[in-house]
């Protein structure tokens, strides 16, 4: 394509930037829809569908809940002394022992999950005057009746059940978790058959706390052939403290303690399969990459994960403002510089030059300005990820029915946090996009001004991103302009002379229009005079008669 106004004594140099036929729409602070040459998606909207077992240690609960594994349900014995980073509970988990309830189930589950271990230490509790190791047909261990392996069901010995008073000090330097329980018989007959007394009582104390439980005797819905229940309780004994257990019946005693650890282990409900792969971020839907700052896969996460937002898509501009190249314009197929449109097909840079001189036409990228823009944009995605990705986990929240108001408040807080992060993400991306577009526009303007300062009076700004150079400028001359070594003094005299000649020709060419208009006016006047004279002559000879009626 030819550039306008060229002959052997002049040249034309245009500056422009990269463009693509179909850009990407992004949002900025000042414009909801602006087209750029390239953009990166910031929201991860899909998972792998599987949970990766690396770098986190994943423990698959299979058909056991964490609490069943903690108590020692017979079908969960494989989990004894296990450790994990993330315990995965399955929807098909079930209990196969004596029916029980945990009044503070959510707290116990969360406490054990964060500890990341089921390491159990057996202690020598002395239970005098009672029968130990009680079992039930509802809790088969093999063909025989059994019970939870971490608990000791105490019943009467003969016809007596003495008052039990046992102490166990914590002489170690770590917290100890003791699990114990209270049996609620279904009938008074069952109560006396097991514990002699018509009503038992269990009190468990430390220096910091005390719990007293009185059994509730009564029939309940049948579960695995039992209408009685066991309530599970737990006590933490600090270093230097003492555990005191006092009971006259219905005690489900501890066999030892669980060693508590501090850490960032957690628990998650998921039916996604566990596979051999690597992923830092895990959701109930499966693992997701954490190479994006945001995700809308699931609010529940574990590991170094993107922030959860409501948006399905947020695009970060990683290219310049896109102005697709116009089709050939004008009689000679002229094209303009960056002020009118971008240039398609410039694959070796973002900014560049097009020229036409006596040696022909050419195009070259300006690598320095291109690299300056790329260097500033490349770090944007990493900076956004650093601002949002943190090593934390958002666990599931569970509340009992009596804690409904707390659950509502928790849900409100979580929803508010998500709303805030969604808004912050929108603003953050819009700000970064605005900065990117301003930055790339600035680099184009810098290159244009740099070229203008080099050419000075040797060229004229054509107003469309191009310069008309008023001296002969071969390819070596064009290259010197591009690389900044152009010396305008060398060409100044030639440029001034050519400028005056070209302007003079343009001035003389302008008089032709005036002459044409004057000639046309005189011709019209003479034609009117001749016509009028002919009419007057014809009237005098009588060839034309003119009647005027009033």
Curated annotation (Swiss-Prot):
Residues linked to a lipid group, S-palmitoyl cysteine type: 539, 546, 549
Positions of the site: Cleavage? Answer: 329-330
Q: Name one GO biological process term.
A: fusion of virus membrane with host plasma membrane
Q: Which GO cellular component does the record give, naming just one?
A: viral envelope
Q: How is it modified after translation?
A: Palmitoylated. In natural infection, inactive HA is matured into HA1 and HA2 outside the cell by one or more trypsin-like, arginine-specific endoprotease secreted by the bronchial epithelial cells. One identified protease that may be involved in this process is secreted in lungs by club cells.
Topological domains, Cytoplasmic: 536-550
Keyword set, alphabetical order: Clathrin- and caveolin-independent endocytosis of virus by host, Clathrin-mediated endocytosis of virus by host, Disulfide bond, Fusion of virus membrane with host endosomal membrane, Fusion of virus membrane with host membrane, Glycoprotein, Hemagglutinin, Host cell membrane, Host membrane, Host-virus interaction, Lipoprotein, Membrane, Palmitate, Transmembrane, Transmembrane helix, Viral attachment to host cell, Viral envelope protein, Viral penetration into host cytoplasm, Virion, Virus endocytosis by host, Virus entry into host cell
Q: The organism sits in which domain of life?
A: Viruses
For membrane topology, the record states: Single-pass type I membrane protein
- Regions of this protein lying in the Extracellular compartment: 1-514
**Which ranges does the record mark as transmembrane?**
515-535
Principal subcellular localization: virion
Entry-linked HAMAP family? INFV_HEMA
How it assembles, according to the record, is: Homotrimer of disulfide-linked HA1-HA2.
Q: What is this protein for, i.e. what is its function?
A: Binds to sialic acid-containing receptors on the cell surface, bringing about the attachment of the virus particle to the cell. This attachment induces virion internalization either through clathrin-dependent endocytosis or through clathrin- and caveolin-independent pathway. Plays a major role in the determination of host range restriction and virulence. Class I viral fusion protein. Responsible for penetration of the virus into the cell cytoplasm by mediating the fusion of the membrane of the endocytosed virus particle with the endosomal membrane.
Q: What is this protein's record name?
A: Hemagglutinin
Gene name, per UniProt, is HA
């Amino acid at each position: 394509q030819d550039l306008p106004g060229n002959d052997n004594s002049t040249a034309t140099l245009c500056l422009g930037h990269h463009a693509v036929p179909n850009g990407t729409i992004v949002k900025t602070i000042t414009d909801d829809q602006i087209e750029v040459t390239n953009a990166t998606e910031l929201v991860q909207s899909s998972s792998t569908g599987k949970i990766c077992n690396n770098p986190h240690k994943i423990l698959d609960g299979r058909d056991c809940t964490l609490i069943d594994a903690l108590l020692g349900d017979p079908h969960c014995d494989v989990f004894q002394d296990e450790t994990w980073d993330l315990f995965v509970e399955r929807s098909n988990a079930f209990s196969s022992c004596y029916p029980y309830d945990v009044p503070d189930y959510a707290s116990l589950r969360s406490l054990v999950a964060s500890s990341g271990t089921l390491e159990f230490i057996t202690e020598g509790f002395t239970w005098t005057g009672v029968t130990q190791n009680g079992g039930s047909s509802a809790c088969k261990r093999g063909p025989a009746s059994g019970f939870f392996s971490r608990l000791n069901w105490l019943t009467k010995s003969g016809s007596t059940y003495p008052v039990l008073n046992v102490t166990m000090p914590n002489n170690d330097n770590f917290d100890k978790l003791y699990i114990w329980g209270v049996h609620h018989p279904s009938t008074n007959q069952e109560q006396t058959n097991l514990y002699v007394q018509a009503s038992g009582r269990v009190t468990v104390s430390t220096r910091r706390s005390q719990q007293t439980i009185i059994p509730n005797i009564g029939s309940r819905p049948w579960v695995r052939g039992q209408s009685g229940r066991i309530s599970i309780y737990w006590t933490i004994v600090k270093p230097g403290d003492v555990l005191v257990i006092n009971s006259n019946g219905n005690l489900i005693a501890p066999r030892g303690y669980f060693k508590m650890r501090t850490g960032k282990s957690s628990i998650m409900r998921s039916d996604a399969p566990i596979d051999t792969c690597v992923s830092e971020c895990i959701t109930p839907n499966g693992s997701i990459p954490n190479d994006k700052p945001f995700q809308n896969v699931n609010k529940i996460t574990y590991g170094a994960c993107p922030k959860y937002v409501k948006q399905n898509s947020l695009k970060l501009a990683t290219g310049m403002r896109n102005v697709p190249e116009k089709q050939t314009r004008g009689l000679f197929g002229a094209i303009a510089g960056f002020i009118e449109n971008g240039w398609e097909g410039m694959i070796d840079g973002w900014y560049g030059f097009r020229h036409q001189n006596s040696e022909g036409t050419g195009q070259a990228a300006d690598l320095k300005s291109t690299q300056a823009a790329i260097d500033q944009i490349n770090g944007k995605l990493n900076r956004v990820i650093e601002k949002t990705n943190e090593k934390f986990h958002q666990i599931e929240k569970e509340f009992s029915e009596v804690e409904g108001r707390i659950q509502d408040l928790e849900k409100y807080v979580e929803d508010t946090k998500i709303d805030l992060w969604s808004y912050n993400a929108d603003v953050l991306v819009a700000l970064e996009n605005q900065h990117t577009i301003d930055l790339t526009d600035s680099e184009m303007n810098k290159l244009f001004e740099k070229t203008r300062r080099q050419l000075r009076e040797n060229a004229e700004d054509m107003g469309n991103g191009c310069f008309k150079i008023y001296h002969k400028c071969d390819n070596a001359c064009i290259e010197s302009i591009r690389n900044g070594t152009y010396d305008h003094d060398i060409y100044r005299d030639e440029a001034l002379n050519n400028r005056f000649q070209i302007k003079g020709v343009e001035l003389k060419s302008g008089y032709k229009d005036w002459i044409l208009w004057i000639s046309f006016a005189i011709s019209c006047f003479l034609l009117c005079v001749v016509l009028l004279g002919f009419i007057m002559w014809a009237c005098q000879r009588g060839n034309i008669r003119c009647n005027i009626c009033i």
